[in-house]
């Protein structure tokens, strides 16, 4: 008796698929966000040590956490921002909170994921929960961030090597690319307008150091140097982060992979509700492809990036409406809502 390998023949029942789809996408988003946040904290600590003044405030701005942060802190200092974003259990955007949310999604996915994937997430989460104030001092933060990034990259490697390639993996990869696109636009938006009024001027030692920090925050410094050696003009850096087809964290690259994953959900698994989402992603890609970097900057970089972020939020909303389970009955327990950068996930 032969076993069918047709992906359509192995579809899960719709409610089960919906739950797994949601958890797969948010697991990827949370782990990607943890790695991005650890990298930005690490780069900021190095950059501020060299004399920058607004680096810690920029982290709060990138994550759109001004209201939450300044409700309990009068100023964005190193100690306060690091504690807020690493160990603050009351902050849903802290690395520890994100890791706990990721583990809960992995728990729901336990029938689908490997023992290695589950064990590594558990070990990582327990490590973060054990952190104390002395572990996150500015003098220790670089080493800590390196450990966090390494754990996230280990998760990515285990997932790549063990996660079965079906709808769940497509939702996982779509979530990772959606998060990358959102994070890169936030980074460019805040950093570009923070760094433009540099008194020392374009091309100065301070200016070069600042734009180097932007590239390092996006894990793109060495890739950029390969193709743009010696050119650290703001427009060149922005162009690379937006439009490089070869840099995996660029906006254009993230949107291409996002489109591929959602398109496969429609074509390979006959999920017809993906059609409108594919069209929105195509609309978003066209908005990027139809303009040069110079045109985007001249017409308004902030306005363009704000438009991209709104389109990305609409993509997430439409995915949820198309594939997530319907709301629970009123008699059911209230879900715990995790709010991240203007987007939410309801966790039972």
Regions from the PLM with identified roles:
Residues 2-348:
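Alpha-helical transmembrane segments and their helix-helix packing motifs
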């Amino acid at each position: 008796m032969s076993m069918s390998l047709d992906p359509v023949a192995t579809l899960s029942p719709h409610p089960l698929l919906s739950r797994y789809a949601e958890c797969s996408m948010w697991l990827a988003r949370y782990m990607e966000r943890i790695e991005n946040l650890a990298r930005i904290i690490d780069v900021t600590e190095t950059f501020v040590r060299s004399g920058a003044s607004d680096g810690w405030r920029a982290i709060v701005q990138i994550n759109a956490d001004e209201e939450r942060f300044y409700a309990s802190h009068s100023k964005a200092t190193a100690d306060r921002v690091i504690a807020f974003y690493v160990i603050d259990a009351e902050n849903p955007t802290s690395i520890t909170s994100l890791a706990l949310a990721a583990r809960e999604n992995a728990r729901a996915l336990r029938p689908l994921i490997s023992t290695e994937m589950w064990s590594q997430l558990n070990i990582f989460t327990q490590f973060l929960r054990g952190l104390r104030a002395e572990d996150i001092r500015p003098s220790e933060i670089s080493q800590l961030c390196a450990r966090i990034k390494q754990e996230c990259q280990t998760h990515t490697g285990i997932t790549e090597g063990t996660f079965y390639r079906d709808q769940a993996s497509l939702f996982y990869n779509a979530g990772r690319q959606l998060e990358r696109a959102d994070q890169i636009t936030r980074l460019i938006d805040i950093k570009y307008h923070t760094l433009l009024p540099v008194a020392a001027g374009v091309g100065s030692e301070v200016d070069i150091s600042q734009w180097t920090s932007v590239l390092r925050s996006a894990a793109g410094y060495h890739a950029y140097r390969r193709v743009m050696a010696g050119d650290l003009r703001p427009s060149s850096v922005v162009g690379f982060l937006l439009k490089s087809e070869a840099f995996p964290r660029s906006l254009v690259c993230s949107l291409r992979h996002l489109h591929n994953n959602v398109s496969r959900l429609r074509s390979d698994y006959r999920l017809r509700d993906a059609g409108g989402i594919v069209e929105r992603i195509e609309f978003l890609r066209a908005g990027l492809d139809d303009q040069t970097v110079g045109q985007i900057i001249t017409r308004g970089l902030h306005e363009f990036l704000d438009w991209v972020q709104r389109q990305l939020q609409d993509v997430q909303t439409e995915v949820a409406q198309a594939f997530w389970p319907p709301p629970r009955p009123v008699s059911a327990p209230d879900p715990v809502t995790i709010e991240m950068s203007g987007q939410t996930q309801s966790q039972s």
